[in-house]
Amino acid sequence: MSSHIAKSESKTSLLKAAAASGGSRAPRHSSARDPGLRGRRLPGPCPDSPATCGDPSSRRPLCRPVPRDEGARGSRRGLPQAHCRPRETLPPARGRDGEERGLAPALSLRGSLRSRGRGDPAPAGTPEADPFLHQLRPMLSSAFGQDRSLRPEEIEELREAFREFDKDKDGYINCRDLGNCMRTMGYMPTEMELIELSQQINMNLGGHVDFDDFVELMGPKLLAETADMIGVKELRDAFREFDTNGDGEISTSELREAMRKLLGHQVGHRDIEEIIRDVDLNGDGRVDFEEFVRMMSR
């Protein structure tokens, strides 16, 4: 009798426990059955857990996959990015050698300056050397730029172009041939420029242009073309102005004398040493032509 009562009590307790656990269990797929909950994300743990996910179609990825054409360079085709980091914070692209792309060449050049006896060198662009280098460049621009006079070879170039279009050899070309002459010399004037030029010639020059007028018209264009271009020939000519003894190198005394002539005042010995220290890459205390070119193109 006692054993029968114990079995009944155990069954009763099991039924009560099952009822208690079943009453607290959430209905499965409630979001799919209830129309009011469709399209809403259920709060709770990770949506990938099968115990808490609703309809599999209602799952949302943690990060929107990036289209193929917007993906990061080097990522596998068709796969989303690993995380949603903004594109601006991505590290810069690197080449095969491991160096970052897009670095200015001047950084590597300036970083290659050697250590000097008086301590670390003043990097390019320091206050010690810059004022004088900034004064030297306008001097060369005035010698080879737009505010200079035409050189003999440039005047000869204009003369040859003028002769080619002076068909009757009377020393004049008409305004209609001036546009073709300009195109022959490599200039491409617009129609508006040609109209204005023709009006100027017809009003002031009687419709014809002699050689002096031609030089006055074309000279500024020729100078403007070469204003920002200092070629090897011009740089060698400028280097010879500094290298007075012709040994192929500019010494401290030669640089000081050349700067005195160009700037119109004497430059101190210490300032000259700072300039040479700033541009002397091989450390011999003198400036050769290659270093001079680097100095003027910086």
From Swiss-Prot:
Principal subcellular localisation of the protein: cytoplasm
A GO-annotated cellular component: glutamatergic synapse
Region described as Disordered: spans on this chain: 1-131
Stored InterPro entries: CaBP1/2/4/5, EF-hand-dom_pair, EF_Hand_1_Ca_BS, EF_hand_dom
Modified residues (Phosphoserine): 251
Post-translational modification: Phosphorylated. The phosphorylation regulates the activity.
UniProt GO MF annotations: calcium channel regulator activity; calcium ion binding; calcium-dependent protein binding; identical protein binding; nuclear localization sequence binding; protein domain specific binding; transmembrane transporter binding; type 3 metabotropic glutamate receptor binding
Binding annotation for Ca(2+) 1: 166, 168, 170, 172, 177
Keywords, in A-Z order: Calcium, Cytoplasm, Cytoskeleton, Developmental protein, Metal-binding, Phosphoprotein, Repeat, Sensory transduction, Vision
Start-end of Basic and acidic residues biased regions: 1-10
Subcellular location, record wording: Cytoplasm; Cytoplasm, Cytoskeleton
Binding site for Ca(2+) 3: 280, 282, 284, 286, 291
GO biological process per UniProt: modification of postsynaptic actin cytoskeleton; negative regulation of cell communication by electrical coupling; negative regulation of protein import into nucleus; postsynapse to nucleus signaling pathway; regulation of synaptic plasticity; visual perception
Occurrences of domain EF-hand (ranges): 153-188, 207-224, 230-265, 267-298
Oligomer status and interactors: Interacts with ITPR1, ITPR2 and ITPR3. The strength of this interaction inversely correlates with calcium concentration. Interacts with CACNA1A (via C-terminal CDB motif) in the pre- and postsynaptic membranes. Interacts with CACNA1C. Interacts with CACNA1D. Interacts (via EF-hands 1 and 2) at microtubules with MAP1LC3B. Interacts (via EF-hands 1 and 2) with NSMF (via the central NLS-containing motif region), the interaction occurs in a calcium dependent manner after synaptic NMDA receptor stimulation and prevents nuclear import of NSMF. Interacts with MYO1C and TRPC5. Interacts with SPACA9.
Domain remarks in the Swiss-Prot or TrEMBL record: EF-1 binds magnesium constitutively under physiological conditions, EF-3 and EF-4 bind calcium cooperatively and EF-2 binds neither calcium nor magnesium.
Protein task: Modulates calcium-dependent activity of inositol 1,4,5-triphosphate receptors (ITPRs). Inhibits agonist-induced intracellular calcium signaling. Enhances inactivation and does not support calcium-dependent facilitation of voltage-dependent P/Q-type calcium channels. Causes calcium-dependent facilitation and inhibits inactivation of L-type calcium channels by binding to the same sites as calmodulin in the C-terminal domain of CACNA1C, but has an opposite effect on channel function. Suppresses the calcium-dependent inactivation of CACNA1D. Inhibits TRPC5 channels.
PANTHER family in the record: CALCIUM-BINDING PROTEIN 1 (PTHR45917:SF1), CALCIUM-BINDING PROTEIN 1-RELATED (PTHR45917)
UniProt name for this protein: Calcium-binding protein 1
Species per Swiss-Prot/TrEMBL record: Rattus norvegicus
